[in-house]
Structures are given as structure tokens and as C-alpha cells.
Amino acid sequence: VQDFKREAVRHAEEEHPKESAGLVVNGSYFPCRNIAPDPEANFVINPVDYARAMLAGTIEAVVHSHPQGTPVSDHDRKACRQTKLLWYVYSVPDKQWSTIKPS
């Protein structure tokens, strides 16, 4: 298991039942605050956290959790394409990872 995933799982468990959100920066997990109006259904990374991540190094991927175990959504796929970054989605109840690649 990639090291960042251990930290991301811990963050997802701490944030449950809300979606956790973070970034992979230089191979390490960078937790971010989810400022979505409905954080149990989706996520929006706090722009201050995103800026701090950019200053810390190269943003390599977006990470977020699905607290209810729902599969990767069409919205996730579309957002992944828009960011042009790899996305990792962690299903909390299933303890399973999904990866989305930008196309």
C-alpha cells in the first residue's frame, strides 16, 4: 500500500460521516478541509488548503472518501478530467480504493 493511502484512510475515518478530501503532494498525503455545503454527499477542497499544498510541492493527485460506499460517480470522472490529475476514491465501509485517470 502506498504510504499516502494509510494517512488518507485515517483522515477518512476521522471525517466520517463526511467526505474527506486531500491531495497527494510529492508522494505524501496532504489533508484538506472539505467546505462543501453538504459534506456528507460531496467535497470541495478549501482553497487556502489547496494553495498551501501548491506551495509545499507538486500536486500529483486528488483523494477523497465515499462514506456510504457508493461507487465512483460520473461527477468524479468529470471532475478528474477537469483537474487533469489522478483521483483516488476510498470507500469507507468497503475499505476499498478506486482510481480514476484523467482521459
PLM ranges: what are they?
Residues V1-I59, P67-S103:
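Conserved beta-strand-loop surface patch within small alpha/beta domains used
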Residues V62:
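Cys-dependent condensing catalytic cores that perform Claisen condensation/acyl-transfer
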